Swiss-Prot record:
This is CRIB domain-containing protein RIC5. PROSITE patterns: CRIB. Pfam families: PBD. Residues 55-67 have a biased composition (Basic and acidic residues). Keywords: Cell membrane, Growth regulation, Membrane. Over-expression of RIC5 in tobacco germinating pollen reduces pollen tube expansion elongation. It is a peripheral membrane protein. It is found in: Cell membrane. Interacts with ARAC11/ROP1. The keyword Cell membrane applies. The gene is RIC5.
Length: 193
């Protein structure tokens, strides 16, 4: 049995050498810097050398004018609305569609920085005192500060006397100033954190 296996292997090696010896002519596609025909289709207008598969498609300039024409005829069926996705456009600085994270025309930072910035705003809110407003606030988000007294634990049982005024309430003032900047902060719990 070893001799037929050797003969089979010799035949396979012979066939493999034939394919190894045959070299196909290498096809040169083009100079690597010559990619205008691929990368810049439609940038300089239609050319005479467009590929045959591109004849079915319209240039981008014609599609823009057609979408403008159809938007004049049928408002609401514009193709541009579909391209923009789910973004909503705001009508003004104090419009209700504008996000509450936008303060004074500045854009909200990324999700990574919001925690750090909130801590900084909390710190600056405690430094600002009780009667000063932060310069970033707009009229829409200004919450008037009122003096709130802490409820004593005895009030739940019916004791009901306010705590003495000499007790420090720095945490409450900080929470109030943070709520003035971020009106949604602390709505879920009374402690704020």
């Amino acid at each position: 049995m070893t001799s037929p296996m050797k003969g089979l292997l010799k035949g396979l090696r012979y066939i493999a050498r034939i394919f190894e010896d045959e070299k196909e002519p290498e096809m040169q596609i083009g100079i690597p810097t010559d990619v205008k025909h691929v990368a810049h289709i439609g940038w300089e207008g239609p050319s005479a050398t467009t590929p045959s598969w591109m004849h079915d498609f319209k240039p981008t300039d014609q599609t823009k004018t057609e979408t403008k024409g159809t938007s004049n005829k049928k408002p609401g069926s514009s193709g541009e609305k579909h391209r923009k996705g789910r973004r909503k456009t705001s009508t003004g600085n104090n419009s209700p569609t504008e996000s509450p994270s936008r303060v004074g025309g500045s854009v909200r930072p990324s999700k990574r920085n919001t925690g750090k910035q909130r801590e900084q705003n909390t710190g600056s809110g405690s430094e600002s005192g009780s009667g000063l407003e932060l310069p970033q606030q707009t009229d829409q988000f200004v919450v008037p500060k009122q003096s709130k007294q802490k409820k004593s634990k005895g009030s739940a049982t019916g004791g009901g006397e306010p705590p003495p005024s000499n007790e420090p309430s720095n945490k409450k003032e900080t929470d109030i100033s943070v709520r003035a900047v971020y009106p949604c902060a602390g709505l879920g719990s009374s402690t704020g954190r």
